[in-house]
């Protein structure tokens, strides 16, 4: 399988959303850019901010859609068209209610699982054949509390766990960029 050429962090723009659970995808690509010493640039034709990084000797584009979460597909598909990147060479990093804070999982293909950024991207692509990095944020316990939960800020303890999961995911990105997803998954999914 081809390696990654585009890594998208899903989230909501604006300072009021900056440290919310729903912006775990933004936090992931921001940490990748920081580690690489890359700078973010506004790119209106791609409806977001972009950064160019080197991972495992390969050029990889990072993208933070400036659309709100439920319109993320517009930015994702614009970037894929502009840079001529296939969906299979794309990873979308997003918050995951079904995983505990401190857990991150890689996945290829599938549905949206109620995640609106994935839903919009799948709608525009016509399929879900792209990679996902699911960053655990935990579940509030009842579906009626989900909106407030994802749009809220995590506790200090959960914030540390989420940051640790992001660091663990960054550690396996060289393997994913080289196309060795099975080894990347094995390392990320094996408890330490």
From Swiss-Prot:
It catalyses: an N-acyl-L-alpha-aminoacyl-tRNA + H2O = an N-acyl-L-amino acid + a tRNA + H(+). Its main location: cytoplasm. GO terms for cellular component: cytoplasm. It is an enzyme of class 3 (hydrolase). TRNA binds at residues 17, 68, 70, 116. Hydrolyzes ribosome-free peptidyl-tRNAs (with 1 or more amino acids incorporated), which drop off the ribosome during protein synthesis, or as a result of ribosome stalling. The record marks 12 as: Discriminates between blocked and unblocked aminoacyl-tRNA. The active site is at 22 (proton acceptor). Belongs to the PTH family. It comes from Stenotrophomonas maltophilia (strain K279a). It comes from the Bacteria. This is Peptidyl-tRNA hydrolase. GO terms for biological process: protein quality control for misfolded or incompletely synthesized proteins; rescue of stalled ribosome. Its EC number is 3.1.1.29. The gene is pth. CDD domains: PTH. Gene3D superfamilies: Peptidyl-tRNA hydrolase. PANTHER family: PEPTIDYL-TRNA HYDROLASE. The keyword Transmembrane does not apply. GO terms for molecular function: peptidyl-tRNA hydrolase activity; tRNA binding. Monomer. The record marks 95 as: Stabilizes the basic form of H active site to accept a proton. It is found in: Cytoplasm. The keyword RNA-binding applies.
């Amino acid at each position: 399988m081809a390696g990654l050429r585009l890594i998208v962090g899903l989230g909501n723009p604006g300072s009021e959303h900056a440290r919310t659970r729903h912006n775990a995808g933004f936090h992931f690509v921001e940490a990748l850019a920081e580690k690489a010493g890359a700078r973010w640039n506004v790119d209106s034709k791609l409806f977001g901010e972009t950064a160019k990084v080197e991972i495992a000797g390969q050029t990889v584009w990072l993208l933070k859609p400036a659309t709100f979460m439920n319109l993320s597909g517009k930015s994702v598909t614009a970037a894929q068209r502009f840079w001529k990147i296939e969906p299979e060479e794309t990873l979308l990093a997003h918050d995951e209610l079904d995983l505990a804070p401190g857990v991150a999982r890689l996945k290829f293909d599938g549905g949206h699982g109620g995640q609106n950024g994935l839903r919009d991207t799948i709608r525009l692509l016509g399929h879900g054949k792209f990679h996902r990095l699911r960053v655990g944020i935990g579940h509030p316990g009842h579906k009626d509390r989900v909106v407030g939960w994802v749009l809220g800020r995590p506790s200090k303890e959960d914030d540390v766990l989420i940051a640790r999961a992001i660091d663990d995911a960054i550690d396996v990105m060289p393997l994913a960029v080289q196309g060795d997803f099975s080894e990347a998954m094995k390392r990320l999914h094996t408890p330490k």
